[in-house]
């Protein structure tokens, strides 16, 4: 459904270039002291059986990992916000050349030129990274712990809850809460989210 809806917003004759991002910070030594934070790119247009091959994913770059001078600094809200801001500004730096293609891009597929517009369709990440991408509170004990909707913690396991009983977390409504200084009411961090500007 997302694919069709998104493709309908593109100019006539253009197709969707589905970007899939994979991100996971990893340790690079046996002591766990050194870390790298790679971000990979794949395409949703590639069939799943092919997309899972090693050569169908490309390293887009490494996101910086900020190190605190001490535990006090590490726990400070200033440092935590700096980490979040750095993450989102780094994503902007990495993704802007792709996303800002105002007239799309022509790709040669089977000797035929096809007009595409790139859009991020999926971000694959673990819980802490999903929180960083969405800028939601990291604790599963927060009032609204879900990255996708504004369901309360008490209703997370409620199997009788209807989708109409919750409000989805969309770019627009999260941005509105942020711009109205109400981000804490929906458990998002006080940092501007790069993805709010994405088409």
Predicted regions and their residues:
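Charged (Asp/Glu and Lys/Arg) segments that form or flank catalytic channels of large polymer-
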Residues: 1-25, 62-64, 69-91, 95-199
